[in-house]
Amino acid sequence: MERKLALLLFLGMVTLASCGLREKHVQKLVALIPNDQLRSILKAVVHKVAKTQFGCPAYEGYCNNHCQDIERKDGECHGFKCKCAKD
């Protein structure tokens, strides 16, 4: 039962992360899980999923929106990651 709950939480967090929610929002959900090895694993997985930015090649304008949201700069897709314009 505990594995099923952990898997359900994990899939829910991955879904939320891939829907445009930022990592900090999903990590707040991870904080609700009791402090143990499972929590550490979920935090690491959410961090890795958030870094890959799957929406980059799939959605036109994703990187521009992402960079405007976090740095107020224009952005472009570079592989599976967004690159924000330098000053």
UniProtKB/Swiss-Prot annotation:
> Primary place of residence?
secreted
Entry-linked Pfam families: Scorpion_toxin_alpha-beta (PF14866)
Q: Between which residues do disulfide bridges form?
A: C56-C77, C63-C82, C67-C84
Extract one GO cellular component term from the record.
extracellular region
GO biological process per UniProt? defense response to bacterium
Beyond the main fields, what else does the record say?
The primary structure of this cryptide Pep-3 is identical to that of cryptide Pep-3 from other Tityus species (AC P0DRE8, AC P69940, AC P0C2F3).
Q: Mind telling me what this protein is named?
A: Scorpine-like peptide Tco 41.46-2
Origin species, per record, is Tityus costatus
